Structures are given as C-alpha cells and as structure tokens.
Amino acid sequence: MNIIPQPLSLKEHQNFYLLSYNTYLVVEGGCTRHIYRQARLLQEAIEKNTGFSLHLTKGEARTGDILISYCENVPDPEYYRLEIDPEGVRIEGTQQSIIYGIQTFIQVLEQSGARLPGLSVEDRPRLPFRGFYHDATRGRVPRLSYLKTLADQMMRYKLNQFQLYI
C-alpha cells in the first residue's frame, strides 16, 4: 500500500473489508460540525471512487460501518489512527487530526476500490510545519479557484502551511 506521506506505523493484515450499499458512514455523537463537514468530503470521495452513495449519520456504528470517532486522549494533537478490518473501518483522532485519517483512507480507497485491505495505521506529523511555497512574482498571479484547488491538494498530502509570494 502506497500512502503519501508514509505513516509512522502501517501494518497490513491478510483480511479485507468490503464496502456495500448497506454501509453507513457514521460520525460519533461527540464530534463537532467541523468533523461532520470532513465526513462529507469522505462521503463524496467514496461515491467518486466506488459509485456507492453511503448514508451519513450521527450516532453509534453497526458492524460493517465506517466510524469517524473523536478522541482527545492521544499522544499528539495531530495523531490519528485508521483501522480497516472485516468488522468495519474506524478513523479516530482529534478535531485537528481526523482530516489526516480521512485523507489516508481516501488514498487507500483510490488504490483498492470497494474491496479494502485490512490495515492498521497510526500516524502523526514528524515536523510541526509542513508547507508549500508558491512564488508568483515572475508570472501571472494565480486565480482564487486555482488556490482553492491547490489547498485541496495540500490537504491530501497533510501540509499545513501555504506561503504565496506575490
């Protein structure tokens, strides 16, 4: 499995998880609206990559569902854990780090489709600042739509700083 950037811990298992039309995308009750918006991004990515339009709901997950869980008791504010097994998918982290777990899951989804390999991923950034520097002094100033697309790509690779030099 190729995940960029490479996580601190990635363990592949022999089992797999199969997405289906009966799968729900569940956001745990204690999650904020910010996390719920991130879950919508995951819902769109699942539909784009598999064709399944999963129901997004709050509450408790059933066996076989995808659960996004808020957890404060983590070693680092940007730490997350992703577990994929036959029982379902669990993405755990802080409000700040759940987006990183979602982005990792999307990378797995893009490589595997609806039949996801069993994985255990634990990750946190190695550096506090991970950024992209865009120098537009000798060319055209980028449009806002381009900058938004660039920000989406930065989120995909877990970058947290953007410097635009005009």
Labelled PLM ranges:
Residues 105-108, 112, 135, 153, ...:
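Mid-sequence acidic-hydrophobic segments that form the walls
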Residues 28, 135, 165:
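Conserved residues at the C-terminal ends of beta-strands
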Residues 80-82, 142-150:
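Short, polar loop/linker segments at the starts of domains and inter-domain junctions
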Residues 1-130:
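Contiguous, structured surface segment used for ligand recognition
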Residues 146-166:
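Catalytic domains of carbohydrate-active enzymes, especially glycoside hydrolases
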